[in-house]
Amino acid sequence: MYLFFLIVFIFISFSLIFFILLQPGKGLNNTVHSHTKNNIKFFNSIGTNNFITKIIKILAFFFLLISIILCNINSKRIDSDFFWEDNQNNTITKKHVLDKKKLNLDIPN
């Protein structure tokens, strides 16, 4: 499950980069660099880039959603391993109490 989401996450990342770089600039320098008729026809056929901006919004939403899912999956793996090991050894409370005593040695009563 984790591997599937990771592969989809990487694919969405690269496609976001591709579509963001595909957008033409809207400044005056853009006309200097695109004198060919093919570039103008390609970008005008999209319809003032509404299609590309919608795709970018959808991909950005999925990027955020999958990153949250990956974080939750990863944190559950770490937390479950941590509590499983500590429940076997029963060392959480002993170490915790000893650490507090060590920290309070320098403080006068």
Curated annotation (Swiss-Prot):
GO terms for molecular function: protein-transporting ATPase activity. Keywords: Cell membrane, Membrane, Protein transport, Translocation, Transmembrane, Transmembrane helix, Transport. Pfam families: SecG. It is found in: Cell membrane. It is a multi-pass membrane protein. It comes from the Bacteria. The chain crosses the membrane at residues 2-22, 51-71. The keyword Signal does not apply. Involved in protein export. Participates in an early event of protein translocation. Belongs to the SecG family. Part of the prokaryotic protein translocation apparatus which comprise SecA, SecB, SecE, SecF, SecG and SecY. This is Protein-export membrane protein SecG. It comes from Buchnera aphidicola subsp. Acyrthosiphon pisum (strain APS).
